[in-house]
């Protein structure tokens, strides 16, 4: 069962299963957040915004409202 990326704890590695909001799909795809890609949640800010991730060897920061639309499975 897939979980929202926004609900994953720091230090966990997951695999993207889908992006559920069309408006941000292209932006996330350009950053490497595509189905099948591994993501490591590096750090989460105290109020959960932003979330620092590593995807395709790059460090990225996502807003909470972006991370909630990325569905993932734990490895």
Predicted regions and their residues:
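Compact, glycine-rich, soluble single-domain proteins
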Residues: 1-75
